[in-house]
Structures are given as C-alpha cells and as structure tokens.
From Swiss-Prot:
Locations listed in the record: Cytoplasm
Keyword Isomerase among UniProt keywords: yes
Family from the record: Belongs to the class-III pyridoxal-phosphate-dependent aminotransferase family. HemL subfamily.
GO biological process: protoporphyrinogen IX biosynthetic process
Descriptive protein name: Glutamate-1-semialdehyde 2,1-aminomutase
Taxonomic source organism: Rhodopirellula baltica (strain DSM 10527 / NCIMB 13988 / SH1)
InterPro entries named among the record's database cross-references: 4pyrrol_synth_GluAld_NH2Trfase (IPR004639), Aminotrans_3 (IPR005814), Aminotrans_3_PPA_site (IPR049704), PyrdxlP-dep_Trfase (IPR015424), PyrdxlP-dep_Trfase_major (IPR015421), PyrdxlP-dep_Trfase_small (IPR015422)
Length: 439
C-alpha cells in the first residue's frame, strides 16, 4: 500500500534522499550502518533510510510507505509506536533515564517473564540478546565446571566469539561465518553440528558427553530463514543433555513471546534448563534477559560466583517498554490471529510462486515465515545454503517497488504484527505474484 509519492513506477528502488543519507553515513560509520544486514549487502543497492514507523507501516525519508514485515527484526509484535508502550516509555523517561540502582519495575518485569516462560524460575535482565547468550554460556560453564558447548550450523546467537562459528543471520548472508578477530582459542571448545541431525547429536555426546557444559539452539531457527525443528531432534537434545548432566539452552531471543506467549518451549512442550530472551521482551527498547532453573541462576554473582554485570542492565525506560508489551500480549493474546495471517500469506506465496514456475518452499511457525528460493524443504544449513540468492535479491527489490518491505536476506524470517490485516496480506500476495512472474 503505497503513498502518493510511492506510486510512480519510474521511481528508483532507493530514493535520492536515501542515497544521499547512505553516502553520508558511509563516511562516518563502517559500511554506513550499525548492524551489517541493514546495508543490503545480500540484495545489492542502497538501503532505505527510515523516518518513522506506525502500526504495520514504515515510512522512508523519500516519502514512501511500506507494509513492514521486518518489525525491527522481531520486537514489534504489537506494531510500531503502540500508544500504551509509548506512554509507558514517556512516563518512565520523565522520572529519569537511568539510576544504576534497583527498582520495583525490574521485579514486575521479572515476574511477568517467570510466569510466562516454563523454564525460568529466576531471571537476570541485560541489554541485548547477544549479552543474554554470552552470559548464559558463562553461567552454564560455571555451573557444570565444563568447557565444551554444542551449537548448530546456521543458528545465530549474537556476536559472541565462541558462537560466531558457522553462524546464521548476516554472517551467513555475507559469506563470513567465521569472523576475523575471533581467535582459534575462542572457538576451540565449540562443537558445530547440523540442525535436526539426531545421529550427529548422539555421536557428539557419545564422544564428548562428560565434557559438554551446554547445548544451545534456536528452537525455531530464524537466522537461516524460518526452519522448524523435528520433535525427534528437540526430544533428543533434551534427553541427551539430561543424561550427561549438560545444560540445555534455548535461544528464544526471536521466538520468545512470538510463536507463543511462553515461546517455542510452550509451543513444542520441551522445557530447557536455561532460556535467553531479547527483542519482544524489551518492547522495542534495548533489553535482553537470561534465566532458568533456580539452582543454575543462583550461580550468578552476588548469589554465586559467576560474574556478570551491566551499567544499564534493568534500565527503567527499557523495562517499562518490555513490561507494557508483555502485559498487552497477555491481556489480548494475538497468537491465533497471527497464525491465521501466517497461514494466509504462506498459502498465497506458495500459489504465487507455483504459478510463476519458481522453485520454492514455504516454512512458517506462528508469526514467522520464509519463502525459500529452493525446491527442497529446508531443515538445516546445508539445504538453506542452496537457495537462489540472486533470485531472492530481485524478488526483494521488486516488492520494495510495490510498497512491501521484506527482510533484505533470504536467511532472515519475516514477522507479522498485531496491526497487520487480511487486506494487507492479500495486497502482499498480489504484489508477490506480480514480482515473481517478472523474475
């Protein structure tokens, strides 16, 4: 759904103001951005610079409006600038933006998280999902006295040195799964396995079980596209970690409060020992959390000896946004609505791609979805890596010209908000059909 300024078929993919803004930013910041995927490296061209967002829409500085399927890469499940969240932020900021001291609001948010997430008995607030996963690994190693960690190719757990190995997200998109600056020593205790490979998991525990501190995974992968686990795989992860005394960590930074109020662990009925959270839990503000069994979390200083701290941890403005968001999700759960929208879009994209003769598959979980330019069902990174990246890039820019803003990478799931409607879904399907037929 385009604004009048967006209706001209002759306009370039990125408007002149975005082009100028990117040139300026590139002289000031590495690559012109503060997070790699935003540079549009996977699709080419100039990134769009955003002026504002409201409900399900983004507005760029050239005056174009887009139906937004990024949602700030996941947090905006209520839609952009929800009035009650903005009010909570405004009221909190008016009292002071940071105290460096405890507040009752932190306890209220902690209670909301503990009530919602099955695995969490105690929780620690931090500033990002990356910080949450980094801290959870340290706690797991401290609690077990072991060193080795299992992760899965294509799973992204933030820019943590020991986990930036065969990572998804921008690392996969840009062809740099192993970053310069990450020393061999930082990753030597990380075992990388194939997602959904039960036999590989069994073999790893047979060989290293007594040395494995933790197994960390995305219970629905969102950083090599939307990839679902098999129940056999999740149950094997749970059973093997229990048998060998290792800690099972679900990275629910993306899935937490999105695929169900209690996250993927509620959706699938598999309870980990620890959980990491981000995105929705902060209501669009910089906030993350990690938590789990009380005996594990009591290892964290000052209750225990594992050090973790942060100047802005429990920031009152971020806590207010997160608490308001979780309250609204509990009072008026959007999950059935989001499932219906996902079904509608998945079916429509499947029909459009089939009609266009495009080799594809569609995968979804709750309010997460990916159209893969690959005829094989994607269940691991080896299959995801065979997607047609060039076709995806043309598809992305075609949709931009139709006023639809999808993630700028084949390997990022798209997200819905409570503000999306069936009419918007139908408009998106019609745009996709037009673009796919032109590829």
């Amino acid at each position: 759904m385009n604004s009048p300024a967006n209706s001209s078929a002759a306009r370039p993919a990125a408007g002149p103001k975005s082009v100028a803004a990117f040139q300026r930013a590139s002289a000031l910041m590495p690559g012109g951005v503060n997070s790699p995927a935003r540079a549009f490296g996977a699709v080419g061209g100039t990134p769009l610079f955003i002026e504002r967002a409201e409900g399900p829409y983004l507005y760029d500085i050239d005056g174009n409006r887009y139906i937004d399927y990024i949602g700030s890469w996941g947090p905006m499940i209520l839609g952009h600038a929800h009035p009650e969240v903005i009010n909570a932020i405004t009221q909190a900021a008016a009292k002071g933006t940071s105290y460096g001291a405890p507040t009752e609001a932190e306890s209220r948010l902690a209670e909301q998280i503990i009530e919602a997430v099955p695995s969490i008995e105690k929780v620690r607030l931090v500033n990002s999902g990356t910080e949450a996963t980094m801290s959870a690994l340290r706690v797991a190693r401290g609690a077990t006295g072991r060193k080795k960690v299992i992760k899965f190719a294509g799973n992204y757990h933030g820019h943590v040195d020991s986990l930036l190995v065969a990572a998804g997200s921008a690392a996969a998109t840009l062809g740099a799964p192993d970053s310069p600056g990450v020393t061999p020593g930082a990753a030597e205790d990380t075992l990388v396995l194939s997602y959904n490979d039960v036999s590989g998991l069994q073999n790893a525990f047979a060989q290293h079980g007594d040395d494995i501190a933790a197994l960390i995974l995305e219970p629905v992968v969102g950083n090599m596209g939307c990839v679902l686990p098999t129940m056999e795989f999740l149950n094997a992860a749970r059973d093997l970690t229990t048998k060998h005394g290792s800690i099972l960590i679900f990275d629910e930074v993306m899935t937490g409060f999105r695929v169900a109020y209690g996250g993927a662990q509620e959706r699938f009925g598999v309870t980990p020992d620890m959980t990491t959270l981000g995105k929705i839990v902060g209501g669009g503000m910089p906030l993350g959390a990690y938590g789990g069994r009380a005996d594990i979390m009591n290892q964290v200083l000052p209750a225990g000896k594992v050090f973790q701290a942060g100047t802005l941890s429990g920031n009152p403005v971020a806590v207010a946004a997160g608490s308001a968001t979780l309250r609204l999700l509990k009072e008026n759960p959007p999950y059935e609505q989001l499932e219906r929208l996902a079904d509608r879009l998945a079916d429509g994209l499947d029909r459009a791609a089939t009609s266009a003769g495009m080799a594809h598959t569609v995968a979804k979980a709750g309010a997460m979805l990916t159209l893969f330019f690959n005829p094989e069902p994607v269940d691991c990174w080896a299959v995801a890596d065979r997607c047609d990246r060039e076709a995806f890039g043309r598809y992305f820019w075609g949709l931009i010209d139709e006023g639809i803003y999808m993630p700028c990478s084949q390997f990022e799931a798209l997200f819905f908000s409570q503000q999306h409607t069936e009419a918007m879904i139908d408009e998106t399907i019609a745009a996709a059909e037009k673009v796919l037929k032109s590829l």
